Amino acid sequence: QECKCHGLSGSCEVKTCWWSQPDFRVIGDYLKDKYDSASEMVVEQHRESRGWVETLRPKYTFFKPPTERDLIYYESSPNFCEPNPETGSFGTRDRVCNVSSHGIDGCDLLCCGRGHNTRTEKRKEKCHCIFHWCCSR
């Protein structure tokens, strides 16, 4: 909720409030946190009076069971390291990676443990520098 005050000289004689969406970054960070802590489930079939019923149970019982607010999954993601025409993935071979990053663009993650080649480039470029005389005597 956001609010704004109205009045003379910034006084808050009238206050108007409205609901607003959180910052997009906050929402993204929240969803990423949920994704990273998602619980893997197993589909079990059992017979009841009305026929076969499928239920989900946590794959790993030593973790606490997921709540209604947690994300769950029962199929693993495909291997994005190798090309897969079915999913349209080209794999990660020959991609440019960032040696100093530990994020998704880092070589350890992006190269899927295959190792990476490092190339050093030297470039001569015009810097478009301009000399500004700063001071008078």
UniProtKB/Swiss-Prot annotation:
Gene3D superfamilies: 3.30.2460.20. GO terms for cellular component: extracellular space. A lipid is attached at residue 9 (O-palmitoleoyl serine). Pfam families: wnt. Its main location: secreted. Keywords: Developmental protein, Disulfide bond, Extracellular matrix, Glycoprotein, Lipoprotein, Secreted, Wnt signaling pathway. Glycans are attached at residue 98. InterPro entries: Wnt, Wnt_C, Wnt_CS. GO terms for biological process: canonical Wnt signaling pathway; cell fate commitment; neuron differentiation. The keyword Metal-binding does not apply. GO terms for molecular function: cytokine activity; frizzled binding. SMART domains: WNT1. Disulfide bonds join 3-17, 5-12, 97-112, 134-135. It is found in: Secreted, Extracellular space, Extracellular matrix; Secreted. Palmitoleoylation is required for efficient binding to frizzled receptors. Depalmitoleoylation leads to Wnt signaling pathway inhibition. Belongs to the Wnt family. Ligand for members of the frizzled family of seven transmembrane receptors. Functions in the canonical Wnt signaling pathway that results in activation of transcription factors of the TCF/LEF family. Required for normal embryonic development. This is Protein Wnt-3. It comes from Xenopus laevis. The gene is wnt3.
